[in-house]
UniProtKB/Swiss-Prot annotation:
Residue positions binding substrate: 84, 133, 187, 197-198, 213-215, 222, 257, 289-293
Pathway(s) annotated for this protein in UniProt: Carbohydrate biosynthesis; dTDP-L-rhamnose biosynthesis; Bacterial outer membrane biogenesis; LPS O-antigen biosynthesis
UniProt record, GO biological process: dTDP-rhamnose biosynthetic process; lipopolysaccharide biosynthetic process; O antigen biosynthetic process; polysaccharide biosynthetic process
Cofactor(s) in the UniProt record: NAD(+)
Keyword NAD: yes
Name of the protein: dTDP-glucose 4,6-dehydratase
Function: Catalyzes the dehydration of dTDP-D-glucose to form dTDP-6-deoxy-D-xylo-4-hexulose via a three-step process involving oxidation, dehydration and reduction.
Reaction equation(s) it catalyzes: dTDP-alpha-D-glucose = dTDP-4-dehydro-6-deoxy-alpha-D-glucose + H2O
Residues given in the record as NAD(+) binding sites: 12-13, 32-35, 58-59, 80-84, 99, 158-162, 188
Record flagged with keyword NAD: yes
Entry's family note: Belongs to the NAD(P)-dependent epimerase/dehydratase family. dTDP-glucose dehydratase subfamily.
Taxonomic source organism: Xanthomonas campestris pv. campestris (strain B100)
Gene this protein is translated from: rfbB
Length: 351
């Protein structure tokens, strides 16, 4: 049985990845600091499962990471741990530098030392996979897509911190020979998503009868990737990716933000109509745009398709229907989040 050390495995993408990995017979050591977006309720179905070992801790704690590596002897380390919300990075960039840059460095140092001491056969097979974002590339005009050779041009404190972490991973490969892989993904959506992000925020506010905030004119474009497609892409890169390479992961589903909100409203009108009969779109409220808001992201994932045979299984229409249905049938999970410190408020609106 393979063993993977997964960092950030109680978050949105990491949590979905851990659930799928354990179901596929992987033994997972899950290291998560359980900051505001980490949620053990996401992993409730794994309680008592011997193949899931949860450890509360920070990737910046080199001694802890070293102990876990020595104790569990993983065949791969997958780094999902990150502060990831652009609005929060505008309000408080320091936490993003600490986790995404300093934390990644500490993790890399511990993993490098562990990898160097492995027997030859295990050392050759070992992989460090770093999960990153398309936001490191900056913004696009009306045409074109990000490729793996697009120059980095991050525009927010969040994307700058992720760009720095990507560069550290690359440097540890070229300097020390660490067998790394990097994935840069587009906007994810799906189950277990913390409701500060657009899709779960709109669902929660719509059900609460609150205004649905749309930044600026709502015509910012994002490529939307269903989270289970992303998890499959990561497993594919881990199994077949070329060491030292970067792979873009996209859903081939470009949508304006306002189109996403309208799609959610239509699904809620169908499955959970308002008592007064009004359409959910009547709750849409245009608000001041995010400072420095990137206009358009679009991913060219042809390298991943051509080299490794991966492509998304879900269209946006399929994925958003599954997502809305999940939130409607899992309100206990949502309420558990909203009973904490987060109350669907906007942050990072001013500089």
């Amino acid at each position: 049985m393979a063993t993977w050390l997964v960092t950030g495995g109680a978050g949105f993408i990491g949590g979905n990845f851990v659930l799928e990995a354990v179901s596929r017979g992987i033994r997972v050591v899950n290291l998560d600091a359980l900051t505001y977006a980490g949620n053990l309720n996401t992993l409730a179905s794994l309680e008592g499962n011997a193949d899931h070992i949860f450890v509360k801790g920070d990737i910046g704690d080199g001694a802890l990471v070293t102990r876990l590596l020595q104790e569990h002897q993983p065949d791969a380390v997958l780094n999902f741990a990150a502060e990831s919300h652009v609005d929060r990075s505008i309000e408080g960039p320091g936490a993003f530098i600490q986790t995404n840059v300093v934390g990644t460095l500490a993790l890399l140092e511990a993993v490098r030392d562990y990898w160097k001491a492995l027997p030859d056969t295990r050392r050759d097979a070992f992989r460090f996979l770093h999960v990153s974002t398309d936001e490191v590339y900056g913004t696009l005009g009306e045409t074109g897509k990000f490729t793996e050779t697009t120059p980095y041009a991050p525009n927010s404190p969040y994307s700058a911190s992720k760009a720095a972490s990507d560069h550290l991973v690359r440097a540890f490969h070229h300097t020390y020979g660490l067998p790394v892989l990097t994935t840069n993904c587009s906007n994810n959506y799906g189950p277990y998503h913390f409701p500060e992000k657009l899709i779960p925020l709109v669902i929660a506010k719509a059900l609460a009868g609150e205004p649905l905030p749309v930044y600026g004119d709502g015509k910012q474009v994002r490529d939307w990737l269903f989270v289970s497609d992303h998890c499959e892409a990561i497993r594919t890169v881990l199994a077949k990716g070329r060491v030292g390479e970067t792979y873009n992961v996209g859903g081939n589903s470009e949508r304006q933000n306002i189109e996403v909100v309208q799609a959610i409203c239509a699904l809620l009108d169908q499955h959970r109509p308002r008592e007064d009969g009004k359409p959910r779109e009547s709750q849409i409220a245009y608000v001041t745009d995010r400072p420095g808001h990137d206009r358009r992201y679009a991913i060219d994932a042809s390298k991943l398709k051509d080299e490794l045979g991966w492509e998304p299984a879900y269209t946006f229409e399929q994925g958003i229907a599954l997502t809305v249905d999940w939130y409607l049938t899992n309100q206990t999970w949502v309420q558990g989040v909203l009973d904490g410190s987060y109350r669907l408020e906007r942050i990072g609106a001013t500089v």
